[in-house]
């Protein structure tokens, strides 16, 4: 297999490393306009180019788009026009969605969208518990981390999360909403308030408080921020006879035992991998699982867990939260 990685920053390098773990024989080709990044990947033993046009001549079987979201549309379009099965990181904006979906169908090409949290073992357990409970629940969820700490090796000003269209809070909603909508269902109504409390050089709000009412009667409160000094992912789900707790990592998932009145630890991973450069709530296993899902979709063995069609709805909720018409 020959794989093209477009965008050789931290995420592109992660995809290379994980892809080689899935298939050590895979041939990697990299594309990036920055010479320094190309040199780093060439030192890893991989061929690189400065343009997709050059790389497409190598006839890759699949491509992974790991650039800033605002650049995705143009890149994905070129890849699909070259009939390359394409995996893309979160888009956060719906630029060209209808065109890209139609182009993929016309060229019989896979168009696959990342949604890593759907592959987390803890959230699969929570999803199963909530659906088996089969009654409305209440949930409280806080997700946050101080923006400069996301990529401590570079300035947040040079990172797409400083762009108002793809800002840090929107990125967090883009990561979390797909699993929330899968587990709790479509949204009937929402109310959101936001403001800015930090001294960061940004032109968007840095904290959001959102109340969601789902069509099935479930209600939830979500707090998202780019303020918290310690990375936070805290979830509590409760109903009459159900109480779940999760602190964002595989070592912190609990279900309340109504008989013993104790919290029972739920183990969803035999082993899990973690990149020490990131907070402890980022688990590598989920990234591997979604990449394997993509490769199996290309091979005709599986259906994707997420799609551009589903993401259009997710983005519509994000736009409502941010007050975008």
Q: What is each of the regions a protein language model found here?
A:
Residues 46-58:
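Short acidic low-complexity segments
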Residues 117-193, 198-201:
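Predominantly a Rossmann-like dinucleotide-binding segment in NAD(P)-dependent oxidoreductases
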Residues 66-67, 143:
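Glycine-rich, N-terminal phosphate-binding loop of Rossmann-like dinucleotide-binding domains
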Residues 62-65, 286-325:
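C-terminal helix-rich "cap/oligomerization" subdomain common to oxidoreductases
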Residues 62, 68, 73-118:
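Beta-strand-loop-alpha-helix segment that lines the small-molecule cofactor/substrate pocket
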Residues 172-252, 281, 288-301:
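Contiguous beta-strand/loop segments that form the cofactor/metal-binding neighborhood of enzyme cores
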Residues 1-44:
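N-terminal Rossmann-like dinucleotide-binding module
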């Amino acid at each position: 297999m020959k794989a093209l990685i477009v965008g050789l920053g931290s995420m592109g390098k992660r995809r290379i490393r994980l892809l080689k773990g899935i298939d050590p024989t895979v041939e990697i080709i990299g594309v990036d306009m920055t010479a320094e990044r190309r040199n780093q990947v060439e030192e890893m033993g991989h061929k690189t180019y400065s343009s997709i046009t050059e790389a497409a001549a190598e006839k890759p079987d699949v491509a992974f788009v790991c650039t800033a979201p605002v650049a995705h549309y143009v890149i994905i379009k070129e890849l699909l026009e070259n009939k390359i099965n394409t995996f893309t990181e979160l888009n956060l904006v719906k630029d060209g969605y209808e065109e890209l979906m139609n182009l993929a169908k016309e060229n019989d090409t896979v168009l696959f969208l990342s949604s890593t949290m759907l592959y987390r073992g803890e959230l699969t357990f929570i999803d199963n518990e909530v659906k088996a409970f089969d009654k409305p629940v209440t949930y409280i969820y806080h997700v946050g981390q101080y923006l400069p700490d996301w990529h401590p090796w570079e300035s947040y000003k040079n990172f797409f999360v400083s762009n108002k269209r793809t800002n840090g809070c929107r990125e967090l909603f883009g990561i979390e909403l797909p699993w929330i909508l899968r587990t709790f269902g479509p949204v009937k109504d929402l109310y959101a308030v936001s403001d800015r409390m930090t001294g960061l050089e940004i032109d968007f709000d840095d904290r959001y408080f959102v109340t969601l009412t789902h069509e099935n009667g479930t209600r939830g409160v979500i707090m998202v921020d780019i303020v918290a000094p310690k990375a936070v992912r805290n979830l509590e789900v409760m109903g009459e006879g159900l109480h779940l707790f999760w602190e964002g990592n595989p070592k912190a998932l609990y279900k309340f035992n109504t008989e013993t009145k104790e919290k029972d630890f739920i183990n969803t991973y035999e082993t899990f991998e973690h990149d020490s450069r990131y907070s402890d709530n980022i688990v590598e296993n989920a990234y591997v699982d979604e990449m394997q899902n993509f490769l199996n979709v290309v091979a005709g063995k599986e259906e994707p867990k997420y799609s551009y069609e589903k993401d259009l709805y997710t983005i519509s909720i994000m736009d409502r939260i941010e007050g975008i018409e």
